[in-house]
From Swiss-Prot:
Its EC number is 3.1.3.-. It is an enzyme of class 3 (hydrolase). Belongs to the phosphatase IpgD/SopB family. It is found in: Secreted. A motif (CX5R motif) lies at residues 315-321. Pfam families: IpgD. This is Inositol phosphate phosphatase SopB. Keywords: Hydrolase, Secreted, Virulence. GO terms for molecular function: phosphatase activity. Gene3D superfamilies: Cell division control protein 42 homolog. It comes from Salmonella houtenae.
């Protein structure tokens, strides 16, 4: 009885914590950073502030609040859902360099009933699609006028698809199942969106999702857990994105091929990213750290953005691996804007690249998002393991001990 009483007390305490974190104000985080005379703005917009009128766009309104990463039984809302953008101030206006949607895993994994868990995962997936539509204002306007619109999403899940030391393998399966159920060929789905009059309006979308899973932690990159399961999803998603011929030298097909046929003059960065991704795939470079743990994940998001497809990425909580992916992508977007050259897979940032990375890590809003979710800022990706060989390459990539410590923060004290 004493043991049971302790368990119930702990559950009550956790529930009160979740309520407090959810009910605090969830507001847009906007930070600027400068490099080589250019001013960049990193913006993180929470679901509660995705608005057309006075209220947020979601049918079950957030009302200025949020859903923290510890809310693992929520079957109505996606966890920790944000729109993330990096822009540059040039010629008197802000120009978006990269924009996407970030969130926690779709599975409400502490719901015990498997049917309810799957229903919850689909509800969360619909919220991600709603946020993705919101991130494309022209598409949203057409949808609100009654047009059935096509919405393409590249989903990059960052879990380790194995149930060794956790249940991430099951979570990946449930996330993939949610995407599959909403994207049957030719399927039209109806989303309810709160319009500028504050009324719920049904919009029709034809969603297409290229759903990847790319393990990025030590279990995946140092021990090889979940790689085979992940790649069974990735082959299908790659063919959707790049066509059936995945040889690096082959002309891209799929969504990329369609985009190149429409915009043949803007092909350089798209072709480079497509080739890099196929090269990573052919040589299984995403199975190892190799100086760049997020080499595949980050390029998939960049390529999606370049071809006007919405990139979405997530881990379990939407704050640590998701935050590092956010920072790596913004680092590359700024670096590309500065040098007009995309970095090659597995390359460490040069001195200027490290300075960009340091500024992004501290000013991208990720420390604030971690604090919003757990009351403590710090990224669990940053750690010192023994023996040294088990560590991912973040000391080398960041290149500054003070920044490394600031990004690590108090993450070791936070449970999940």
């Amino acid at each position: 009885p004493a043991k049971e009483a302790r368990r119930l007390a702990a559950a009550d305490f956790k529930s009160a914590q979740v309520k407090q974190l959810n009910n605090q104000p969830w507001q847009t985080i906007k930070n600027t950073l400068t490099h080589n005379g250019h001013q960049y703005t990193s913006t993180q917009v929470p679901a509660a502030e995705m608005k057309i009128g006075a209220q947020d766009i979601f049918p079950k309104a957030y009302q200025g609040k949020g859903v923290c990463s510890w809310d693992t039984q929520n079957i109505h809302h996606a966890t920790n859902l944000w729109m993330s953008t990096i822009s540059v101030h040039e010629d008197g206006e802000d120009k978006t360099l990269f924009s996407g949607i970030r969130h926690g895993v779709l599975s409400p994994y502490h719901v015990e009933d498997p049917l309810l868990r799957q229903t919850g995962a689909e509800s969360r997936a619909k919220e991600v699609l709603t946020a993705a539509l919101f991130s494309k204002p022209e598409l949203l306007t057409r949808a609100l006028k009654g047009e059935a619109v096509s919405l393409k999403l590249v989903s990059v899940c960052l879990l380790t698809a194995s149930n060794v030391l956790g249940q991430e393998g099951t979570m990946v399966k449930e996330q993939m199942r949610a995407w599959q159920s909403l994207t049957q060929p030719g399927k039209m789905i109806h989303l309810k969106i709160r319009n500028d009059d504050g009324e719920l309006q049904t919009v029709k979308i034809k969603p297409e999702v290229a759903a990847f899973n790319v393990g990025v932690n030590e279990l995946a990159l140092k021990f090889g857990f979940g790689l085979k399961a992940s790649d069974s999803y990735n082959i299908e998603a790659l063919q959707q994105l790049l066509g059936n011929d995945l040889r690096p030298e082959a002309r891209p097909g799929g969504w990329v091929g369609e985009w190149l046929a429409r915009y043949p003059d803007n092909d350089e960065s798209v072709n480079t990213l497509a080739r890099q991704i196929k090269d990573i795939w052919q040589n299984k470079l995403h199975h190892k750290d190799g100086g760049e743990p997020y080499k595949l994940a980050q390029r998939l998001a960049m390529l999606a953005n370049e071809i006007d497809v919405v990139p979405a990425w997530n881990c379990k909580s939407g704050k640590d691996r998701t935050g590092m992916m956010d920072s790596e992508t913004k680092r590359e977007a700024i670096s590309f804007h500065q040098t007009h050259t995309l970095s090659s897979p597995g390359s460490l940032p040069d001195r200027s690249g490290q300075q960009i990375f340091q500024k992004v890590l501290l000013n991208s809003g990720n420390l604030e998002i971690q604090k919003q979710n757990t009351s403590g800022a710090g990224n669990k990706v940053i750690k010192n393991l023994s023996p040294e060989v088990l560590n991912l390459s973040y000391h080398k990539r960041i290149g500054d001990e003070n920044t490394w410590q600031s990004v690590k923060g108090i993450s070791t004290l936070i449970i999940s």
